[in-house]
UniProtKB/Swiss-Prot annotation:
InterPro entries: eFR1_2_sf, eRF1_1_Pelota, eRF1_2, eRF1_3, Pelota/DOM34_N, Pelota_arc, Ribosomal_eL30-like_sf, Transl-rel_pelota. The keyword Iron-sulfur does not apply. The N-terminal domain has the RNA-binding Sm fold. It harbors the endoribonuclease activity. This is Protein pelota homolog. Gene3D superfamilies: 3.30.1330.30, eRF1 domain 2, Pelota, domain A. May function in recognizing stalled ribosomes, interact with stem-loop structures in stalled mRNA molecules, and effect endonucleolytic cleavage of the mRNA. May play a role in the release non-functional ribosomes and degradation of damaged mRNAs. Has endoribonuclease activity. The gene is pelA. It comes from Haloquadratum walsbyi (strain DSM 16790 / HBSQ001).
Length: 355
């Protein structure tokens, strides 16, 4: 996510210019935008001309700049777009004011959002921005006598390591283990969440075995992918196959799963946990919450007043953050979030047990 500008809007609201850069960013926006927010951007709309001096286009689409008051939001995953519908309150054609319109927001579209951001919503957008700037995945490509390491961020790839050496027999050759040692040492120094180890043939498997024996601290980060080439071409193959996106998703799910496992263990042993809105709200009032966990779609429903919780969820979140606790919003699309939903959609890891 890019945030080109931030400013103040009317009635104490904030006005942010946002540019989603991938499907994940569109998904984040679907959990931030709410009814009553204002969203502006470029669009097309079918216009029926009624002016007798102008030729009727039969409803030809025209380019417009509009701002709508949000009524509904739909994340169309398979279309890779976010549909934001509502009444047009500002438009480059005044005769379109008051009509209902749907903005189809896709990757790299710029939109202007005016709303009162809740702390977790602001955190979500800023985390998406940070993800675009920081590399969290390395693509390591290797074949006989050649090895490369690239970091992958949403703005592109950057080569961090490159070695070419003659391995095998001969006066100027070096043992394969020397190349593997340099390669593994470089990977160990990298601050990334996951490493995709790719390349043709079996050299990558041999490198994996070397890492298992000599650099075991990074072995759990490795995912093996077959490619026909190494270097820039190999990285392109990895990206084209969607392997990086898949690894990033699995990394996020893994982090969420660790929290849920800790929660379930606490339930089993009677440790310091709370679950269900009533228990969590009580713990938040006492300042006992260390980490609050909530399912994203449940949070969205409660904010739209279409949920069934009797307590205002934003009050609970504010109490937690004011007392120095953290808030983790889990995706309801994956197993950790689904397990949390079965516990009422909200739970907390506590600093101390409530009597």
């Amino acid at each position: 996510m890019r945030i080109p500008s931030r400013g103040r809007g009317e009635e104490g609201k904030e006005q942010w210019t946002l540019v989603p850069e991938n499907v994940d960013d569109l998904w984040h926006l679907s959990h931030v935008l709410e009814p009553g927010d204002r969203v502006g951007g470029d669009t097309t709309r079918r216009i029926q001309r009624n002016d007798e001096n102008l030729r009727d286009t039969g409803g030809q689409r025209e380019h417009l700049v509009v701002t709508i008051e949000v009524a509904d939001v739909e994340f169309a995953r398979f279309a890779n777009r976010l549909r934001v519908g509502g009444e047009i309150i500002s438009c480059s054609r005044e005769d379109e004011l008051g009509h209902y319109h749907t903005l189809n927001v896709e990757s790299h579209d710029e939109i202007i959002v005016t709303k009162k951001f809740a702390p977790d919503q602001r955190k979500r957008i800023e985390a998406a921005e940070e993800a675009a700037e920081n590399a969290d995945v390395a693509v390591a490509t290797i074949e006989e006598g050649e090895a490369h390491i690239h970091t992958v961020a949403q703005y592109g790839t950057e080569e961090q390591f490159s070695r070419t050496a003659t391995t095998g027999k001969g006066e100027y050759s070096q043992p394969r283990t020397e190349l593997f040692a340099e390669f593994a040492a470089a990977l160990s120094r990298m601050d990334v969440d996951a490493i995709i180890l790719a390349g043709p043939g079996f050299t990558k498997q041999d490198a994996e075995e070397y890492i298992q024996s000599n650099n075991p601290e990074i072995i759990d980060k490795l995912t093996i992918v077959d490619t026909a080439a190494v270097g820039d071409r190999g990285v392109h193959e990895v990206l084209k196959r969607g392997a990086v996106d898949e690894v990033q998703t699995q990394t996020r799910i893994s982090a969420e799963a660790e929290l849920i496992d800790e929660l379930m263990e606490g339930i089993a042993t009677g440790e310091k946990i709370a679950y269900g809105i009533d228990e969590v709200a009580k713990a938040a009032e006492f300042g006992a919450v260390d980490d609050l966990l909530v399912v994203d779609d449940q949070l969205r429903e409660e904010r739209r007043d279409s949920g069934d919780w009797s307590t205002d969820v934003d009050t609970v979140l504010q109490n937690v953050e004011q007392q120095g606790g953290s808030v983790t919003v889990l995706s309801g699309e994956f197993d950790p979030g689904q397990r949390l939903r079965n516990l009422g959609g909200i739970a907390a890891l506590l600093r101390y047990r409530l009597q």
